[in-house]
């Protein structure tokens, strides 16, 4: 038997890699990681040792069973004693809920008859009524009189503004911290990297689809999720767009993922979006596996790429003494892709990726959109629980009943468990594309939670509207800053968010862009009416305008522009912004000359006899006069003559006569600098870093 890596030996022994590493440590065999080698002699000894242990295992099973039964009896007894103690201690500090602030319930809680409390307070000159609602101050006063200690679980209703979804999340936090009921689930993997480094090609090879061929402009423009099976185990892949414009979408992908595969082209190295993708993974505290792609290319340089990983993002490969798994691959030819998948499963095993298979459902939303024949849908990855057709679900203030579940292969399924990517059909409205989806036990519960969330959002919106009004008034007081109003419609919520982010980068001091409305779906007559009222341009991304909207836009003179490639939309918008600016006047030096002689003419003034040294002078140009290096005059030319003839232009090395407008204090030796003012289209300095 040859030497083996730790994870390879664990596979042969049918053991968990982590357990084997613990066993090796107890045996005094030092290994740094799952990738460490074990020599041949040690491998043989371990194989022999574990085969002997298997023979003894059957004899030990009964003894272990007896021990477990004894432990369970002791645990149950302890729980019974603890519960008894809790009941006895209840007289200490009495915990009160908000509904206990009615006098009758309060009296019952503290063990003092309501009538006695009313009588005692009457004797003190204070009147209380049966069932009266108490405030916190009065409740504490009553408790103090009878020397009773109380504590409140909640604050007063008017101060309480808790989002009900926080309580739902708290349930999952408690379950995870307790560790009970958790079981292994498939890893969710995100492939990230620079544009054209091969993300879609890799996923295409793994899943054997033609996604890469369908994308326009070479950019993946929507987030998708797919599940594959490798060596009997499942892996869920999220495909996130690589172009910088979709930073926000990619960041959401990182939040939903367990492992990141950072793909780097061997012929291109670490690029800006590679660094950006790495930062998303790092900030999300997600383990990273590096796939060095395109090793089949003649100019591929794997070692140089590894060096860039170290120098630019401080990822040190395992073979160089670091802890980053690096796998050279060719996504196009499939070379070493199986090894990459094995490494994903290995890292998943080491990370102990788990979920709650029982109880309520919690899912991460990857994308939402309007789907023909289905209405509002949400693509999600289930994190906890099992979602069934017929379940009630909520996402923010939107609720629904699951009418259908569609998996990544387009098949209708009855249920979806942890780590499964699935499309949920049945929402009443389009849910938020970067929210969570939860299951609830009933329709009434769904309505209760969503109505509370809607109420909280309305309060927040009213507060923000007031702030916006103040900002608008302030802007009206300011000077000539131009504004461009836009209406933005796109095919998916993710595209709307990403394009809003890209447009925000184009804001400048000269022009403000107002996206007065953005949404998902076709351009409608309502959009045109809004554009008419606000003098806006309508931009559509991968959507069309319906016939009614087109006719109305033509009649109202509203411009509708539609695009299927992001770059074109942004470039056209830049051109439109620059077209709104007033042309900029720039100064262009045309020539220089020296006054050789001064002619004083009655009723005319002083005429300069000028020797042109370089360039030219024009009759409608502007001149600066310098004396001993100091600027004495700057103004227009009144007349330009050459041999007594009025001319429009004189070039060096010719001589000419120049009369300056409203200035006669000229001397021999004065130097003249001639320039003209040209109007050029102004260019905006777009803030490319804004919103990153």
From Swiss-Prot:
Keyword terms of this UniProt record: Cytoplasm, GTP-binding, Initiation factor, Nucleotide-binding, Protein biosynthesis
Similarity comment: Belongs to the TRAFAC class translation factor GTPase superfamily. Classic translation factor GTPase family. IF-2 subfamily.
Signal sequence residues: none
Region named G3: 239-242
Role noted for this protein: One of the essential components for the initiation of protein synthesis. Protects formylmethionyl-tRNA from spontaneous hydrolysis and promotes its binding to the 30S ribosomal subunits. Also involved in the hydrolysis of GTP during the formation of the 70S ribosomal complex.
Annotated spans, G1: 193-200
Subcellular location: Cytoplasm
Region (G4) residue spans: 293-296
PROSITE patterns, alphabetized: G_TR_2 (PS51722)
Primary subcellular site in the record, as a coarse category: cytoplasm
UniProt xrefs under InterPro entries: EF-G-like_DII, IF2_II, IF2_N, P-loop_NTPase, Small_GTP-bd, T_Tr_GTP-bd_dom, TF_IF2_bacterial-like, TIF_IF2
Superkingdom of the organism of origin: Bacteria
Region (G2): 218-222
High-level lineage: Bacteria, Thermotogati, Thermotogota, Thermotogae, Thermotogales
Annotated stretches, region: G5: 330-332
UniProt GO molecular function: GTP binding; GTPase activity; translation initiation factor activity
Pfam families: EF-G_D2, GTP_EFTU, IF-2, IF2_N
Protein name in the entry: Translation initiation factor IF-2
Keyword Ligase: no
């Amino acid at each position: 038997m040859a030497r083996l890596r730790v994870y390879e030996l664990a596979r042969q022994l049918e053991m968990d890699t982590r357990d084997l590493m613990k066993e090796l440590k107890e045996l005094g065999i030092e290994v740094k990681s799952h990738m460490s080698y074990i020599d041949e002699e040690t491998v043989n000894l371990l194989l022999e040792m574990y085969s002997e242990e298997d023979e003894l295992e059957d004899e030990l099973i009964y003894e272990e069973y007896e021990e477990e039964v004894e432990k369970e009896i002791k645990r149950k007894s302890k729980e019974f004693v603890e519960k008894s103690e809790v009941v006895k201690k209840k007289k200490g500090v009495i915990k009160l809920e908000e509904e206990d602030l009615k006098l009758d319930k309060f009296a019952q809680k503290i063990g003092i008859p309501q009538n006695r409390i009313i009588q005692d307070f009457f004797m003190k000159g204070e009147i209380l009524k049966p069932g009266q609602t108490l405030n916190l101050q009065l409740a504490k006063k009553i408790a103090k009189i009878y020397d009773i200690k109380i504590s409140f679980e909640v604050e007063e209703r008017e101060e309480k503004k808790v989002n009900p979804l926080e309580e739902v999340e708290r349930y999952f936090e408690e379950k995870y911290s307790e560790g009970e009921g958790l079981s292994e689930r498939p890893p969710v993997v995100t492939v990230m990297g620079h544009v054209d480094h091969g993300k879609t090609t890799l996923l295409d090879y793994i899943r054997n689809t033609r996604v890469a061929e369908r994308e326009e402009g070479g950019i993946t423009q929507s987030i998708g999720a797919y599940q594959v099976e490798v060596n009997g185990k499942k892996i869920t892949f999220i495909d996130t767009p690589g172009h910088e414009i979709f930073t926000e979408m990619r960041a959401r992908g990182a939040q939903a993922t367990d492992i990141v595969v950072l793909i780097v082209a061997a012929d291109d190295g670490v690029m800006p979006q590679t660094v950006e993708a790495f930062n998303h993974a790092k900030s999300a505290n997600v383990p990273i596996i590096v796939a060095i792609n395109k090793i089949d290319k003649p100019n591929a340089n794997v070692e140089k790429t590894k060096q860039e990983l170290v120098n630019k993002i401080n990822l040190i490969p395992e073979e160089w003494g670091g802890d980053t798994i690096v796998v050279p691959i060719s996504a196009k030819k499939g070379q070493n892709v199986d090894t990459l998948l094995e490494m994903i499963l290995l890292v998943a095993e080491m990370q102990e990726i788990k979920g709650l298979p029982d109880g309520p459902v919690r899912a991460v939303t990857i994308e939402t959109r309007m789907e023909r024949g289905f209405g509002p849908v949400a693509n999600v990855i289930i994190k906890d629980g099992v979602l069934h057709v017929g379940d009630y679900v909520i996402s923010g203030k939107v609720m629904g009943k699951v009418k259908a579940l569609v998996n990544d292969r387009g098949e209708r399924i009855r249920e979806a468990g942890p780590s499964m990517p699935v499309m949920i059909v049945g929402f009443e409205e389009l849910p938020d594309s970067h929210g969570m989806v939860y299951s609830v036990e009933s329709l009434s519960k769904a309505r209760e939670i969503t109505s509370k969330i809607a109420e909280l959002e309305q309060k927040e919106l009213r507060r923000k509207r007031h702030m916006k009004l103040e900002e608008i008034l302030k802007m009206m007081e300011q000077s000539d800053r131009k504004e461009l109003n836009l209406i933005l419609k796109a095919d998916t919520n993710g595209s709307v968010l990403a394009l809003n982010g890209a447009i925000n980068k184009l804001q400048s001091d000269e022009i403000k862009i107002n996206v007065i409305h953005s949404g998902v779906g076709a351009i409608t007559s309502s959009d045109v009416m809004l554009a008419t009222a606000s003098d806006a341009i309508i931009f559509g991304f991968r959507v069309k305008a319906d016939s009614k909207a087109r006719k109305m836009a033509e009649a109202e003179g509203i411009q509708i522009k539609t695009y299927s490639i992001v770059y074109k939309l942004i470039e056209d918008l830049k051109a439109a912004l620059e077209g709104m600016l007033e042309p900029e006047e720039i100064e262009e030096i045309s020539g220089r000359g020296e006054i050789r002689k001064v002619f004083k003419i009655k009723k005319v003034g002083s005429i300069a006899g000028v020797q042109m040294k370089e360039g030219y002078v024009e009759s409608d140009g502007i001149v600066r006069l310098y004396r001993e290096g100091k600027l004495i005059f700057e103004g227009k030319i009144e007349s330009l003559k050459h041999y007594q003839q009025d001319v429009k232009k004189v070039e060096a090395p010719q001589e000419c006569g120049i009369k300056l407008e409203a200035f006669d204090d000229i001397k021999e030796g004065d130097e003249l600098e001639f320039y003209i003012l040209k109007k050029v289209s102004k260019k905006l300095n777009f803030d490319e870093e804004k919103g990153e």
